[in-house]
Amino acid sequence: MATKAIKFYATWCGPCKIYGKTWTKVEKELTDVEFVEVDIDKDTSGLAVEYKVDSVPHTVVLKEDGSTNAKTGRLNAQELKELILF
């Protein structure tokens, strides 16, 4: 399993819209990472509940070795890269 970055967002969330641009930029740069986006209002997979998402935007990173990292709030490109590459 490759490193996976999961972004939890909502379409009505202003900071999520801004963060989406940063997410797309970093996604293009880190091609070895799987990027997943989950709209919390349409999440039928239960991921938002599993990762205890209570505010958006919220980012969860799952590493190959099973370790995880998470942060709530809008991140800039450098912060997102640091979260993913911890």
Which residues fall in each region the model found?
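Short active-site neighborhood of thiol/selenol oxidoreductases, capturing the structured segment around
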Residues: 1-9
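Short glycine/proline-enriched coil/turn segments at helix->beta-strand junctions
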Residues: 2, 30-33, 86
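Thiol-based oxidoreductase modules, predominantly thioredoxin-like and allied folds used
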Residues: 8, 27-45
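The canonical Cys-X-X-Cys-His
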Residues: 13-16, 59
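Short alpha-helical
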Residues: 14, 42-43, 78
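Typically the conserved alpha-helix immediately C-terminal to a functionally engaged Cys/Sec
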Residues: 17-30
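Short Fe-S-cluster ligation motifs
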Residues: 43-55
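Non-catalytic, surface beta->alpha helical segment in thiol-disulfide oxidoreductase systems
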Residues: 55, 60-86
